[in-house]
Amino acid sequence: NKSKNKPVETLEVEDEENESTDDELLDDFKVKLQSAIANMSPAKFEQFSRALLTKMGVEFTNKGVQVSNDGGIDGYGYHVDADDFRTTRVVIQCKRFNSNPVSEPDINQFLGAMNKYQADYGVFITNSRFTNKAREAAREGTPITLIDGNDLIRLVIKYELYITPVTTYAVSYTHLRAH
């Protein structure tokens, strides 16, 4: 009996190794996705961000926002709540940085633009991160949702934006062992 149990123990270890391999594959995928986003032009990153928010339910107006001298916003549109009762005006700002974080002056400029466009709330998207002072500034006044690089990757996966989900299969050794 002991000799029969030994292979089963080894197979269970292999199952655990398969799980860690899945985590490694996901981490590798996230790194590749972060790299692809970091290599986008600023204009492409704005298009990418609008596409993500469209999947999340924001309907952008056809009136485009100039890429240069955009007054602190990269797009605006409307979000209809799930009950179809209330529509809110949304403005977005996108910053693709390769190393610098989004700072408080960036948020303050965005808050000014939000007031100009009479926005109900704003979404500030970056592939980088936000400084603590930027996060504090975003909590004051009109609500701003901050989406940093990690949030961006999570949302791209959740809404399957420009990615193709792949199904993999693992052998369940516990059901295949000889009795």
Where are these regions (language model features)?
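Mixed-charge (Asp/Glu-Lys/Arg
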Residues: 1-177
